[in-house]
Amino acid sequence: NEHIYTLNMLGVENAYDILRKEMASDDVKFYCVGYSVKQYYQNDYPITNLEGHKCSKIRTELIATFLPEEVVDGLYAAVERAGLHVENLTLEPIAAINIAIPERFRLLNIALVDVGAGTSDISITKDGSIIAYGMIPAAGDELTECIAKHYLVDFQEADRMKCESTEQEEVEFQDIMGLPMTVKSSDIAEVVRENVQSITKQVAEKIIELNGDKSVSAVFVVGGGGKITGFTECLAEYLGVAKERVALRGSEVLREVTFLRQDLEIDSLLVTPIGIC
């Protein structure tokens, strides 16, 4: 185990050296926030796990992700102000994929899309490993802002309307003039339709880029933003895959998790937080 850990750390160190050379600047420092092993090699032969094997040479290919030190310092400061401390640091797509795509599925060419508030995080699996990570700066908040502007409500009210529109046929709200309103969920879906198309188009383009300029076989979608009406259908259309092969993942991948609260709704919103835990 010690040799494997050292091998991985050497890989991260090499990745950091490559990054520094590409940046051509010593002013910005970076912090590794996560890495995933693509493939191990035993005497130049690919192997899933090196542990317990004897050999004269070991090698690894891995993906390492770095953030500027200032960003990481900001994250730590926010946690400390809340009276907490950081136990571990990871990436949302790494956390989500450990729950949503078990290792037995990673032989398949699958994309995982975590549609959060400010970003849509993407990871790709193929031939038994995670081959790429990516991100686009567009997600649920863009839809919330669209609802806020259209119905003249504040951001929090618009976010509530967005969430409720995925669960019920009508949504009640009060605009900034204090007028009570009721709107059909289908009308909200129509209001954000162009934004949904824009986001899914960007996600599809990033998936194709990460996957070697070709589409994937299937897509799992997690996170709150992906629950909006039409999201999975639009993404399937832009990727050129059957609509049934782009789907939200929630309770299907959380069956082995025991929840203390029996009344908790088990859906795609919980996948990433549980992966982080």
Predicted segments — roles?
Residues 1-110, 167-171, 182-189, 210, ...:
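Nucleotide/phosphate-binding catalytic cleft detector across ATP-hydrolyzing
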Residues 20-28, 109-115, 157-161, 263-277:
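A polyampholytic, Gly/Pro-enriched intrinsically disordered region
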Residues 46-49, 115-118, 175-178, 205:
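Short hydrophobic/aromatic-rich motifs at helix boundaries and adjacent loops
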Residues 63-67, 80, 87-91, 98-101, ...:
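Helical "lid/coupling" subdomains associated with nucleotide-phosphate turnover
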Residues 73, 141-142:
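A generic alpha-helix surface/boundary motif
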Residues 103-132, 147:
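Gly/Thr-rich phosphate-binding beta-strand-loop-beta motif of the actin/hexokinase/Hsp70
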